[in-house]
């Protein structure tokens, strides 16, 4: 069970959004690379990074900040936001990124995801961001008529490394993970699922360590870590013991 600390990038800074709203951004660190190193020093073994501007623009916007993060930490990094082509994927993986996260393109062009999995085995994840059970795209700005499980099943057997499942209604508001939908997704597909959105306290960490949650690959934490609601050492110890 992996706890992924999150760095969301907006205008070169480390921020957290409330409900995915770019106008409701709280700046937590003006130096994302320093934040990445701090997470490594706290004992985290992975890092989850999102280029928020890139998610809306459809291409990398905070590239310099991401490159600085890759230089600052020895931990493997997964990146989402604005990665829409095979060239984008190859570019980032060549710079030392461990895993790319494909979101909008997974809805718009599922065949590209399958092609990417063949070209870059084990290095392609799919980000499924949901609102009311339906998938949202373009930085959560647009709703689709595609169901979460319906989309996930399109990639069964394709070699997708993981599905990062985000409940938009809980993201950045410390409401707790949507356990029913997250575990329901994990039960419906063989692809490893990572929970994102809503992780609020050590109670959620303890819930992650419960036997029925061990089917998840892990969970992503942002605001709860930055606000001190989760003790890194205690959380990592609990999850490692549950592995």
From Swiss-Prot:
Gene3D superfamilies: Aldolase class I
GO cellular component: cytoplasm
Cited Pfam families: His_biosynth (PF00977)
Subcellular location: Cytoplasm
UniProt xrefs under InterPro entries: Aldolase_TIM, His_biosynth, HisA_bact_arch, Isoase_HisA-like, Isoase_HisA-like_bact, RibuloseP-bd_barrel
Keywords recorded for this protein, A-Z: Amino-acid biosynthesis, Cytoplasm, Histidine biosynthesis, Isomerase
Record-stated family: Belongs to the HisA/HisF family.
Protein name as annotated: 1-(5-phosphoribosyl)-5-[(5-phosphoribosylamino)methylideneamino] imidazole-4-carboxamide isomerase
